[in-house]
From Swiss-Prot:
Gene3D superfamilies: Winged helix-like DNA-binding domain superfamily/Winged helix DNA-binding domain (1.10.10.10). Residues 172-184 have a biased composition (Gly residues). PANTHER family: PTHR37478, UPF0251 PROTEIN TK0562. Residues 157-171 have a biased composition (Basic and acidic residues). Residues 138-197 are annotated as: Disordered. It comes from Chlorobaculum tepidum (strain ATCC 49652 / DSM 12025 / NBRC 103806 / TLS). Pfam families: DUF134. This is UPF0251 protein CT1277.
Length: 197
């Protein structure tokens, strides 16, 4: 029986998760899957230029394990480029090692950060609005995550978007996620009684 896989620390979720040739006819179900830890290994070794020993220390794994992850990631990149396959970045037994969470206020635009381990703020420190959200690394709303515990494990696409809803009848909708949300809105009294508005 193999040993359980140890959590791998990554700095942040990748901003882009789907890669491939720009042509019609490529199906996403035939795509290669690169885990978050493989993506992080490519980032540390090839983009940041770190030696494997230092990169392994940052991911909190052994140098040998880092080398295996890096070799697997490079093989998938090669297949994507040479064979023209799609590549999806998702899954893996990971934990986010980013030291601070970034929050933003939708009312006044104020941004601030708090270290992990401190409770989520209830209101904006600038304007006291309760319309606050986690910010993604790129600066937009939607950096929140589900899951609990130290390792998040096999995540894919769990970031929540800002939400845009359209209410029924005349009223304001409240959306969940990207696109049209599940807004309910408020009906005017005349409509509730069957009259015209």
């Amino acid at each position: 029986m193999p040993r359980p896989q140890k959590c791998r620390a990554i700095a942040q979720d990748p901003e882009y998760r789907v890669f491939g040739p720009f042509c019609v006819g490529k199906r996403e179900d035939e795509a290669l899957v690169m885990s978050f830890d493989e993506f992080e290994a490519i980032r540390l070794a090839d983009v940041e230029g770190l030696y494997q020993e230092e990169a392994a220390r940052q991911m909190q794994i052994s140098r040998q394990t880092f080398g295996n992850i890096l070799a697997s990631a490079r093989k998938k990149l090669g297949e994507m480029l040479v064979l023209g396959k799609m590549l999806n970045v998702k899954g893996g037994n990971i934990m986010i090692s980013q030291e601070e969470r970034i929050f933003g206020c939708a009312a006044c635009g104020h941004q601030w950060s708090l270290p992990y381990g401190i409770a989520r703020p209830v209101e904006c420190p600038s304007c006291s609005s309760q319309n606050i959200h986690r910010m993604s690394p790129g600066g937009g709303f939607g950096g929140g995550r589900r899951g609990g515990g130290k390792c998040r494990g096999f995540r894919s696409g769990l970031d929540r978007g800002p939400g845009h809803g359209e209410g029924r009848c005349q009223g304001e909708g409240h959306g969940n996620g990207n696109g049209n949300g599940n807004g309910q809105g408020r009906m005017r009294r005349n409509q509730q009684e069957g009259g015209e508005v």
